[in-house]
Curated annotation (Swiss-Prot):
Protein name per its UniProtKB record: 5'-adenylylsulfate reductase 3, chloroplastic
Stretches the record annotates as Reductase domain: 70-319
Gene Ontology MF terms in the entry: 4 iron, 4 sulfur cluster binding; adenylyl-sulfate reductase (glutathione) activity; adenylyl-sulfate reductase activity; metal ion binding; phosphoadenylyl-sulfate reductase (thioredoxin) activity
Keyword Phosphoprotein among record annotations: no
Keywords, ordered alphabetically: 4Fe-4S, Amino-acid biosynthesis, Chloroplast, Cysteine biosynthesis, Disulfide bond, Iron, Iron-sulfur, Metal-binding, Oxidoreductase, Plastid, Redox-active center, Stress response, Transit peptide
Biased composition (Low complexity): 8-23
Region described as Disordered: spans on this chain: 1-24
GO annotation terms (biological process): cysteine biosynthetic process; sulfate assimilation; sulfate assimilation, phosphoadenylyl sulfate reduction by phosphoadenylyl-sulfate reductase (thioredoxin)
Cofactor: [4Fe-4S] cluster
Annotated localization: Plastid, Chloroplast
Amino acid sequence: MALAINVSSSSSSAISSSSFPSSDLKVTKIGSLRLLNRTNVSAASLSLSGKRSSVKALNVQSITKESIVASEVTEKLDVVEVEDFEELAKRLENASPLEIMDKALEKFGNDIAIAFSGAEDVALIEYAHLTGRPYRVFSLDTGRLNPETYRLFDTVEKHYGIRIEYMFPDAVEVQALVRNKGLFSFYEDGHQECCRIRKVRPLRRALKGLRAWITGQRKDQSPGTRSEIPVVQVDPVFEGLDGGVGSLVKWNPVANVEGNDVWNFLRTMDVPVNTLHAAGYVSIGCEPCTRAVLPGQHEREGRWWWEDAKAKECGLHKGNIKENTNGNATANVNGTASVADIFNSENVVNLSRQGIENLMKLENRKEAWIVVLYAPWCPFCQAMEASFDELADKLGGSGVKVAKFRADGDQKDFAKKELQLGSFPTILVFPKNSSRPIKYPSEKRDVDSLTSFLNLVR
């Protein structure tokens, strides 16, 4: 999209807070945006701060025929810089999220904002903070968010010293929906109508005041629908401040980052996160439409789980927790019920208390180790047994040892104090050249996810 802006040199009064009529904008190509080359405009025409963060929208209050003629016969000032965001996306494809964030804030200043949902996209705010540039953050308050999400909003504001710009749904539209269909109509006829009122329309209003926005979309969040996300693009759906298709640029700094790496970054930087993550929530939205996922499930399976039942039946029902025939709900009051052991592959080393203590003391190991802290009665441990045994068989003879340590009963206090045990199962990686184990941060415990994390830290 190309935006051609003609500015008269006769007076600076043509710059005001009113918007360009959409008819004054000439469309060329989606994928590129023509920005005014401010360095070629005289100071008499524009009064701009040297800081990009203070640059406001260039808008015309009134353009007379005389001023247009005058500008054409004197100095030509409609010099434009063509920004090809498709080409920029290619150049930034292998850039770090920090570099991409810095480029976005540098280019758009106060006309760009971070969209924050209250989940792991808090990483975007940390990256923006690390650039040292001013930045804006907005969030959609649907009125149906979890209390934990609202508390995170408050914590983030205090942690970074910012004010989140909240967008709310239209009260009349919400009232009509609830009165006509009730509070939970989405369980009956799908979530699209409710989301359109509570999320999409407020987002449109927010974006109409911007020229660019920053999202936390990642390719691995939904391989079927998000696998082609570029790090920057001209938004093909929403409109920006100047109006019209192509008037808004969308930045996705973490598009190429794996979820595990995002979490490692959050932990390393000690960033405040939503406490729902510790309860098994990965993708977090409105309270009625979000639930925790089970080990091995994809993170998006915790959202709108009642829809497209046939298409998602295998993934959903496979993770369902069934009543344990060993009676673990009543028999293991002290966490030491007599139930069959798990993780029984011949390639899984069974560590004793002394064995894992010795492993912790080693500073220069010959091999890396991946160890699961488990309780055999725990349904989440049982659910990951097959994938962990498969991992052990896959890594046999590879230079990585796979082990288990039963951490319930008398060993639980030790495991909490010395082994970072929070809940079962907890997975630790003991790198070759480090005595301190690294805790696996994700609820995704399939073979590929575990292998990917292991390769990053071993």
